[in-house]
């Protein structure tokens, strides 16, 4: 039995979240009655209202009046008044991943997992399948610039989804094709140990049916080790590694455009196919790897080479992934979601390769617990930045952790030899600090998953006011 058409009104608690909003939008486009609530107005709430979805700001028991089903994300606490009211009324309460899984049962699915790169890779797979004539349904964890949204309902038989591993619920997602970009220590608040994180990814691959396949990056040692432990599923490996089935070659990172080729080989090593002349209009080898994963899927689904080249060349990117927000006196300001040391390092490495000027990093650490558990990694991930400006930690509802704050991060960076590290008290000081550092040709990159995105968009105008 699949998702019934006559389901009644579906209420989303926390509908403005990036994952929840995408599911709500697709359900609405399928003809279901959708409503929801969130704690504050945001761009997702505005977009959903424009699509005819009723959204209330604030969580109150009466918001679920008329609802037959209530959907909640893992961020919703057990004492939420709408959740309590739903249980008092004995309404079905559905986790976000469960509802996503129900949507996935309507199509054949590609699910993209990994600690980093999921959103960009999901967008690339969607772009390639779109160009290949598949007209896919897409539910992503970020705004795809070409769509202006993170979700779309396609008429084709395929769905492309970002599989969020943060709370383990990605194991509920039924996918014919699985991608794993990398596996790093993250979300240990849920998994407790890194071994359990790795075991979850193994289960994710083993959940793929026998007629499906998994695409896995063997440049990452943890993923390569995982490949060796999976026996009964078809695996396609990718990366710069000479042993990869789909190999990234001839990478040229100059000028903010990533040029590369891809070589396909069968396991016997006898057959080889190349696609050369690929040009991805975003910087960074990590993005070339993301594109290689997407190309591996596209070729398996018989997307022609010329369509692959065209799709990669026309890729519009994802909001908050090395997004240019403006210029000031020849310096370019960017906004990026990077908030894990591996992500920050990759973004700064890409920036270093793309400009001959300075790289100025402005970081707003996200969550005290993340900074505490990865403190040494945070202190060494800014090596490609000429200057680092450290803002106060964005708590995301957490209580402070001793020794894990912006002051200690500044001290840690200096202790490990970084030559230029400055503490930032608040956004009102940012323009003055940047103005004293930036020169023509420099890149100013605002990094973090919190409110720093607003600073990044405001910064060009604030710099102009300074003259």
UniProtKB/Swiss-Prot annotation:
Pfam families: Mur_ligase, Mur_ligase_C, Mur_ligase_M. Keywords: ATP-binding, Cell cycle, Cell division, Cell shape, Cell wall biogenesis/degradation, Cytoplasm, Ligase, Nucleotide-binding, Peptidoglycan synthesis. Its EC number is 6.3.2.8. It is found in: Cytoplasm. One of its GO terms (cellular component) is cytoplasm. It catalyses: UDP-N-acetyl-alpha-D-muramate + L-alanine + ATP = UDP-N-acetyl-alpha-D-muramoyl-L-alanine + ADP + phosphate + H(+). It comes from the Bacteria. The keyword Kinase does not apply. GO terms for biological process: cell division; cell wall organization; peptidoglycan biosynthetic process; regulation of cell shape. ATP binds at residues 114-120. The keyword Cell division applies. Pathway: Cell wall biogenesis; peptidoglycan biosynthesis. HAMAP family: MurC (MF_00046). Belongs to the MurCDEF family. Cell wall formation. NCBIfam families: murC (TIGR01082). This is UDP-N-acetylmuramate--L-alanine ligase. It comes from Azorhizobium caulinodans (strain ATCC 43989 / DSM 5975 / JCM 20966 / LMG 6465 / NBRC 14845 / NCIMB 13405 / ORS 571).
């Amino acid at each position: 039995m699949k998702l019934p058409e006559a389901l009644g009104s579906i209420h989303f608690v926390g509908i403005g979240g990036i994952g929840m909003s995408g599911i709500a939008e697709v359900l609405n486009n399928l003809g279901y009655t959708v409503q929801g609530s969130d704690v504050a107005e945001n761009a997702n709430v505005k977009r959903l209202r424009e699509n005819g979805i009723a959204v209330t700001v604030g969580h109150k028991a009466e918001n679920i009046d008329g609802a037959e089903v209530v959907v909640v994300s893992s961020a919703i606490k057990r004492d939420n008044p709408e959740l309590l009211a739903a249980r008092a009324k004995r309404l079905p309460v559905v986790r976000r991943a469960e509802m996503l899984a129900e949507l996935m049962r309507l199509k054949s699915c590609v699910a993209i997992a990994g600690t980093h790169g999921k959103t960009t890779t999901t967008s690339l797979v969607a772009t390639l399948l779109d160009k290949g004539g598949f007209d896919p349904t897409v539910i992503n964890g970020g705004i795809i610039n070409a769509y202006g949204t993170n979700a779309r309902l396609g008429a084709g038989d395929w769905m492309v989804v970002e599989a969020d591993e943060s709370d383990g619920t990605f194991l509920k997602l039924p996918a014919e094709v699985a991608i794993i970009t990398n596996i790093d220590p993250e979300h240990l608040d849920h998994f407790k140990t890194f071994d359990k994180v790795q075991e979850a990814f193994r289960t994710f691959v083993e959940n793929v049916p026998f007629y499906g396949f998994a695409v896995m990056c063997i440049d990452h040692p943890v993923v390569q080790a995982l490949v060796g432990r999976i026996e009964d599923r078809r695996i396609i490996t990718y990366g710069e590694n000479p042993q990869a089935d789909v190999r990234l070659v001839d990478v040229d990172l100059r000028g903010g455009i990533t040029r590369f080729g891809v070589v396909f080989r069968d396991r016997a090593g006898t057959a080889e196919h190349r696609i050369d002349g690929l040009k991805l209009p975003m910087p960074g080898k990590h993005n070339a790897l993301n594109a290689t994963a997407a190309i591996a899927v596209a070729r398996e689904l018989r997307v022609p080479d010329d369509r692959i080249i065209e799709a990669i060349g026309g890729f519009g990117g994802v909001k908050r992934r090395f997004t240019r927000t403006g210029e000031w006196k020849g310096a370019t300001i960017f906004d990026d979601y990077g908030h894990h040391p591996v992500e920050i390092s990759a973004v700064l490495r890409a920036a270093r390769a793309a400009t001959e000027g300075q790289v100025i990093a402005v970081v707003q650490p996200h969550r005290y617990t993340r900074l505490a558990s990865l403190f040494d990694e945070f202190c060494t991930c800014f090596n490609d930045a000429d200057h680092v400006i450290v803002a106060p930690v964005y708590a995301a509802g957490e209580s402070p952790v001793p020794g894990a704050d912006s002051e200690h991060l500044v001290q840690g960076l200096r202790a490990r030899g970084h030559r230029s590290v400055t503490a930032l008290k608040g956004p009102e000081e940012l323009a003055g600090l940047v103005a004293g550092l930036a020169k023509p040709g420099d890149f100013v990159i605002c990094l973090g998953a919190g409110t720093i995105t607003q600073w990044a968009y405001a910064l060009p105008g604030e710099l102009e006011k300074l003259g």
